[in-house]
Structure formats: structure tokens, C-alpha cells
Amino acid sequence: MIKVQREAEPAVLNLTDSDSIGFKELEAAKKTTFTKDTKFPFEAYKDESVKNLLKKMFNGKCGYCESIINVTSYEEIEHFRPKKAINIEGIQGLTYPGYYWLAMSWNNLLISCQRCNRSHKKNYFPIENESNRAKAPGEESGEEVLLLNPCEDDPSEHLEFKDTGIIEFKEGSKKGEKSIKVYALHRRELTEERAKVAKDIELKKVQILDGLSTLKVLLRYQEDSDLQKEIEKTVSNIISLYDFIFEYENDPNRPYQAMVTQITSDFLSERKELINKLKTTSNRKNSCEQSHISS
């Protein structure tokens, strides 16, 4: 999970516009009593413009697990606060009503994969004290929410990843602990997918270190013209590997970016100056060769 900047709401969910679908739906919902048997047509959030904007915001990834959403796992518009009913720990069945007045609220909408939404998050929305549970519009501010919202929280302050793909909550983080459980961010198949990415990144880190060690030896004999090509090849490979990791860490379109950032940031920063020197030297040499060819 990574922090995501929420964009301005699409026109259909402009709740200050009395002509918008969202506004009309909200007014109708306020006049409805929600029970198990209530059939209310929540439709505003299903508008194609809403889904498209959410997909763009989250770069085609699940807002919870950061997996790429593809044809084998369709995206679903997720209500952070459940719209119709709530699963409350310790209470059997669903509790009514849910946060019906937020069903068409842009700030309550995220996008998720089916696994996170249907199999795990479902209608759960744990808070610190049930007596503070909002039952009417405007009462949400009194809740101490126990789940991470990628558009409101910085997940990196609550979640910690290992280079094996394992996720843990940071000490003292109730939100981190509860989010891992409710979103099932520790589920086996998800951990295995993160592990594949982590293994590839860790391999590249080892290759960079090996390359730097090799380069150190080669540079002792840099006057030997027969070794120049080997030196150039080694430098090029080191730079390529470093850039791959750097670009992955900074590309929000990549899956499990949060994990990659955590397991690579120190490694990259500690070698940034050295890599820049190698790039400068390599570019200068290439420039000289081009000038020689041109002349």
C-alpha cells in the first residue's frame, strides 16, 4: 500500500451540485430507512467516469495490496466505510445501517482487487470505540478509525516489509496491525508474489556489489588497453542495474512499490554518489569517442 493523492471528484459525484446524480441520490438516501430488507439503488458511484478516475489515480493497482489489477482479477469500486451495512467484530451478521450517506461520496471511494474487497475487507470497518460509531451524516469525525486509507494515511509509517515479501506492522501502530488482518495483506499468495519481486531486486543488488568489486580490481590495470572493453562493460552493467532499481522504486505503476522502496532506499542512497561518478566518467568517454568519430 502506498500513499495516493486524491484527485478532484468527477461531476457525477459533486454533492454541491443539485443537478448531479450524486446529490439526488444522497437526498433520497437521507429519506430512507436502511434495514436488511431495504432495496436502495446506489448507482452514482458506478458511473464509468468514477471507475476510470480511480483506476488512473491508483495506476491500475489495488489500493490495498498494490497488485496489478488485470483481466483475471477485475477491479471493484470499494467503499472505505461500508455503504449499506457493517460487519462488527463480536456481533454475528451485519449491523444496519451502514454509512449510506457516504455511498456517493468521492472521498469514501477507493479501487481494489476482488480478493481484497470480496474475500477479506467485505463490510468490515473497525473503530476504536463502538459507542462512537457514526449513525448519521457528520458524525464520522468522532470515530477513531483502525484501518489505513491510502488517500488519507501514509502507509509507510505503519507497515514494514522484509526482503522475503513478508509484511509486518510497525511497533505501536494499531492501524497497521488491523489493516494487515482485515485486508489480509499477509495472505500466502500475495506474500509469494511480493517475494518474487523482492528476490529479483535482491539479486540485482548482489550483482551491483559484485560488479563494483570486479571494477575495483580492473581499475588497478586500467592502463592495459586490453582491459578497457571489460571495464566499460562492467561500468555499463552496474549503471543499468542501479537504474532499474531506482526506476522501479520511483514508478507508481509497478506492483509492490512500497516494499521495493523500503528494501532498496538505503542501498541506493549509499551508492548514489559513486554511481553518479561512474555515469559522468562513462558519458565523458562516450562524448570523446563521438567527437573522434565525427572528426
UniProtKB/Swiss-Prot annotation:
One GO BP annotation of this record: defense response to virus
Alphabetically ordered keywords of this record: Antiviral defense, Hydrolase, Nuclease
Superkingdom, natural source: Bacteria
Keyword Hydrolase found: yes
Knockout or disruption consequences: When this gene is missing the Septu type II system does not confer resistance to SpBeta in B.subtilis.
Gene3D superfamilies per record: 1.10.30.50
InterPro entries, A to Z: HNH78-like, HNH_nuc
GO molecular function: nuclease activity
Listed NCBIfam families: retron system putative HNH endonuclease (TIGR02646)
Role summary: Component of antiviral defense system Septu type II, composed of PtuA and PtuB. Expression of Septu type II in B.subtilis (strain BEST7003) confers resistance to phages SBSphiC and SpBeta. May be a nuclease.
Protein name listed in UniProt: Septu protein PtuB
Annotated source species: Bacillus mycoides (strain KBAB4)
